[in-house]
């Protein structure tokens, strides 16, 4: 089910601004002060839109997850979702069968051309926002797979240099982390300091699509397999240095990727990482006469000054948050907690005058990585008011609450737990988003009350 969170209007609606960094933010996200309940939560009943009614619920206490009341399952339904985490036998977030049912009902909805006069196609402007590495570009790649017949052979080939750069970046980050924490090479290790220095200084030729250099591949592969490296990336210092989220995936597939005649798979492309710079407009035909102009903009601080250029006439904002970032700091500012940065950004977006009449879809992304991390890195270390332990449902609901309670502008917020690298998950999520757009358009046109 979708969830609309609303609150009373606040006179102050700040425009989007760069989140400030401070030493007090290191490692922990700030806990909001306790306030009088003022929000209402209403559950959207898409099965019977003619009988829809608003159901109100008091804002849960911020100090104890266990004490939060979930009237009519409003928050719980938003979390039961949209994604199933592969947790290797541990807890899993349950799939909401009702969400599957509602995605199948989309075809039965009246088309937008029936609800509006003029053009047969309804063109919608959608902004894809969020901090760096929250999964925005991966979501856009999934939409290309789902609605634009995927990647051409030429496009697949063009991803080879990027994936090679990702492998090289992994090697360099491992070497830098070992140096920072004074991790010496094992006595029996065949690598030398010269090997590490050569890897650090190696420059991949531009647009290179041949075989990955064998000598550099040997260094990275050997380095990753060292017990001291594994202790470092899985130990208490893991959150203190940067390592791209897809590192385990790429190292698991390292031999295949560095072999002759390498051709990237769809999953290789989805797992690749490239910082978005600039503004990219992608047109997606969603069916039912809906065309979505999706604007993907860079999430790093240096890119956010460009956001203002695409704020006019926005129908929908999709805001991406990485669930697994709760113990991480920004790549561009090692003193700023990533989760705190996302909260500040979300606050500025939902309470901005630019989006006073805009709906917001909140993607709580990377549920798979979140499930793996939760049992290793207690959330209580970063959120003193969280008491849900390693229960993934309680943890996800807590994070959702932290975002929803910022909605002073009374916007409609539709949260989804997502795994952007899972095509079937994103297909299901966008079926639900499409239905939300249909419903809102029909209401605006007077077809629905």
UniProtKB/Swiss-Prot annotation:
Keywords: Cell membrane, GTP-binding, Hydrolase, Lipoprotein, Magnesium, Membrane, Metal-binding, Myristate, Nucleotide-binding, Palmitate, Transducer. Alternates between an inactive form bound to GDP and an active form bound to GTP. Activated by the G protein coupled receptor (GPCR) GPR1, which serves as a guanine nucleotide-exchange factor (GEF), and inactivated by RGS2, acting as a GTPase-activating protein (GAP) for GPA2. Residues 125-138 are annotated as: G1 motif. Myristoylation at Gly-2 and palmitoylation at Cys-4 are required for membrane localization and function of the protein. Residues 7-23, 38-48, 72-91 have a biased composition (Polar residues). The keyword Hydrolase applies. GTP binds at residues 133-138, 245, 270, 276, 299, 365-366, 368, 420. A lipid is attached at residue 4 (S-palmitoyl cysteine). Its cofactor is Mg(2+). It is a lipid-anchor. Residues 122-448 form the G-alpha domain. Transmembrane segments: none annotated. It is found in: Cell membrane. Residues 361-368 are annotated as: G4 motif. Changing residue 299 to A: Dominant negative allele unable to undergo the GTP-induced conformational change. PANTHER family: GTP-BINDING PROTEIN ALPHA SUBUNIT, GUANINE NUCLEOTIDE-BINDING PROTEIN ALPHA-2 SUBUNIT. This is Guanine nucleotide-binding protein alpha-2 subunit. The lineage of its organism: Eukaryota, Fungi, Dikarya, Ascomycota, Saccharomycotina.
């Amino acid at each position: 089910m979708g969830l609309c969170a609303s609150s009373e209007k606040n006179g102050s609606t700040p425009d989007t601004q760069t989140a400030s960094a401070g030493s007090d933010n290191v490692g922990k996200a700030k806990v909001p002060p306790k306030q009088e309940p003022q929000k209402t939560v209403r559950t959207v009943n898409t099965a019977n839109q003619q009988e829809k009614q608003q159901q109100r619920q008091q804002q849960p206490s911020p100090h104890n997850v266990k004490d939060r009341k979930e009237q009519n399952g409003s928050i719980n339904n938003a979390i039961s979702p949209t994604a199933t985490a592969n947790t290797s036998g541990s807890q899993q977030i349950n799939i909401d069968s009702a969400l599957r049912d509602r995605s199948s009902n989309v075809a039965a909805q009246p088309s937008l051309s029936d609800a509006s006069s003029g053009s047969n196609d309804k063109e919608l402007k959608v902004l894809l926002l969020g901090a760096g590495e929250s999964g925005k570009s991966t979501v856009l790649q999934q939409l290309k797979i789902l609605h634009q017949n995927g990647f051409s052979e030429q496009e697949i080939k063009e991803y080879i240099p990027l994936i090679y750069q990702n492998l090289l970046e992994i090697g360099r980050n491992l070497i830098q982390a070992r140096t920072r924490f004074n991790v010496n090479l094992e006595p029996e290790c065949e690598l030398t300091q010269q090997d590490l220095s050569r890897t650090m200084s190696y420059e991949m030729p531009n647009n290179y699509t041949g075989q990955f250099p064998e000598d550099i591949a040997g260094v990275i592969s050997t380095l990753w397999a060292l017990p001291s490296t594994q202790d470092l990336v899985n130990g208490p210092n893991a959150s203190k240095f940067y390592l791209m989220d897809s590192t385990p995936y790429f190292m698991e597939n390292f031999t295949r990727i560095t072999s002759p005649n390498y051709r990237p798979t769809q999953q290789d492309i989805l797992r690749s990482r490239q910082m978005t710079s600039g503004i990219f407009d992608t047109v997606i035909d969603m069916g039912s006469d809906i065309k979505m102009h999706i604007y993907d903009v860079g999430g790093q601080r240096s890119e956010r000054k460009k956001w203002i250029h695409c704020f006019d006439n926005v129908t929908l904002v999709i805001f991406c948050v990485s669930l697994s970032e709760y113990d991480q700091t920004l790549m561009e500012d090692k003193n700023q907690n990533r989760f705190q940065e996302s909260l500040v950004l979300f606050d500025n977006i939902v309470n901005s005058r630019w989006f006073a009449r805009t709906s917001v879809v909140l993607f709580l992304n990377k549920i798979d990585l979140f499930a793996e991390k939760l049992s290793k890195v207690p959330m209580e270390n970063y959120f003193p008011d969280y008491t849900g332990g390693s229960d993934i449902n309680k943890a996800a609901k807590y994070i959702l609450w932290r975002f929803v309670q910022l909605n002073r502008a009374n916007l409609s917020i539709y949260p989804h737990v997502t795994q952007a690298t899972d095509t079937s998950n994103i297909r299901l999520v966008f079926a639900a988003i499409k239905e939300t757009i249909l419903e809102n358009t029909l209401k605006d046109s007077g077809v629905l009350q």
